[in-house]
Amino acid sequence: MSVDHQAEARRQIEICNACRYCEGFCAVFPAMTQQRTFALADMTQLANLCHNCQGCYHACQYTAPHEFAINLPAALAEVRTESWERLSTPTWLAKRVQTHGGLVAGLMLFATIFFLMWSQGVVGGNTFYDYFSHNTLVAIFAPAFVLPLVVIAWSLRRYWREVGGQAVRWAHLKSALKAAANLKNLSGGQQQGCQYEDGDRYSHKRRAGHQLTMYGFLLCFASTSTATVMHYALDMPAPYAWYSLPKILGVVGGVMLSVGTLFLMKLKRTADPKLGSVSRWGGDWVFIGLLFLTASTGLLLWMLGATPAMPLMLAVHLGCVFTLFLMMPYSKMVHGFFRLAALTRDAQTNGG
């Protein structure tokens, strides 16, 4: 781990703790005021509590060219991404994925070619189950989904021990889930929004983009979960009609996820890279792009139906999903898990 990033973030936090002008912006500043010195665990917790709304930067009187050169969003972003890498297993892979987006693109291309070659032996298929049986898909994707979750669980365990987390009560989890659900820490403190893409102007655009993306993803996950229950518990195997619950959840979720990620990409084009982790900027783009491709190819697959283009779109979609699953512990996908853990720990320290 880079000692320079830790030292720089600590220097800035200590100045901010003396100033306290920004303590109404987000959860970072009230948490910061509870102590005078900041160890590695404290910096890890504060960094993951930060949502990079950037409001504190635009309100600060000590940014460059002042000699203090405060840029807290960037300093915490570096510590935050390094904490994901340091606490993951293996660490080198996490760092590689965060800084080399081409690795993710290469895996997606390889997976797509694999699924395309697999489907070549089928002639005249009408549904994607004619190309890949249910059991085949389960055999491929169940390990690709479960094993990364095990890695994430291990990373969160290490995080929890590092920040001194205690036994979680329902009140702690409820507080964290509420803050995550409404993205309270992207509200700017006074519900005026944050300043991510418009310089020093307030906006709720980033909050809206994140909510579209988050809830779209959750609806897609609910679609898959519902289909699983219908298949195994109710003996109702796929394919399902357009008006069935899995289809409705999947289509609505896919549209929300596609629109949300497109919106976030638009905002990211106008954002200032210097207020985030510059070395991981490319990795952020790849992650958002992969989410968009996963959602949009799923929608296209549904719309194409039994057309000749269906096998190709099926291979691309499965390649995207496979890559998204495998890269969960190492891409920015993991930030949601760490942020929820940080919010839970914050609720504990505040007696929530």
Spans of features found by a protein language model:
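Residue-level detector of secondary-structure boundary/capping sites
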Residues: 17, 51, 69-70, 253, ...
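Membrane-embedded alpha-helical bundles of multi-pass integral membrane proteins
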Residues: 77, 83-352
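Immediate flanking context of iron-sulfur cluster ligation sites
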Residues: 3-17, 40-54
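Charged, low-complexity surface segments at secondary-structure and domain boundaries
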Residues: 1, 61-65, 157-164
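Short acidic (Asp/Glu) and glycine-rich catalytic loops that position anionic groups and cofactors
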Residues: 53-60, 269, 319-320
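Short, intrinsically disordered terminal tails adjacent to the first/last structured region
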Residues: 1-4, 352
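Iron-sulfur cluster-binding cysteine motifs and their immediate structural context
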Residues: 17-38, 44-45, 55-83
